[in-house]
């Protein structure tokens, strides 16, 4: 049974067979729905400041 994950950065659901799994040196696993989310996370951008993320909408409610 395929597992549907949520994007660590934007909060959207990731369909099976898509996305990017990033494993940190401490063993924690981060899931990203697109290279856009992965690159923004690597640059240190705050997802709460981007209007298209789920974290932004949760903060503004």
From Swiss-Prot:
Name any one GO molecular function.
zinc ion binding
UniProt KW Ribosomal protein keyword: yes
An example of a Pfam family matching this protein is Ribosomal_L24e
The UniProt transmembrane annotation reads none
Name any cofactors this protein relies on.
Zn(2+)
Q: How is the cofactor bound?
A: Binds 1 zinc ion per subunit.
Family annotation (SMART domains): TRASH (SM00746)
Zinc-finger ranges (C4-type):
7-37
GO biological processes: translation
Q: Does the keyword Ribonucleoprotein apply?
A: yes
Q: Where does Zn(2+) bind?
A: 7, 10, 33, 37
SUPFAM superfamilies, per database record: Glucocorticoid receptor-like (DNA-binding domain)
* Record's GO cellular component terms: ribonucleoprotein complex; ribosome
Top-rank taxon of the source lineage equals Archaea
**Keywords of this protein's UniProt record, alphabetized?**
Metal-binding, Ribonucleoprotein, Ribosomal protein, RNA-binding, rRNA-binding, Zinc, Zinc-finger
PANTHER family per the record? Answer: 60S RIBOSOMAL PROTEIN L24, RIBOSOMAL PROTEIN L24
* Family, as annotated: Belongs to the eukaryotic ribosomal protein eL24 family.
The record ties this protein, via NCBIfam families, to: PRK14891.1-1
What does this protein's UniProt record list under function? Binds to the 23S rRNA.
Question: How does this chain assemble?
Answer: Part of the 50S ribosomal subunit. Forms a cluster with proteins L3 and L14.
Protein name in UniProt:
Large ribosomal subunit protein eL24
Organism the protein comes from:
Hyperthermus butylicus (strain DSM 5456 / JCM 9403 / PLM1-5)
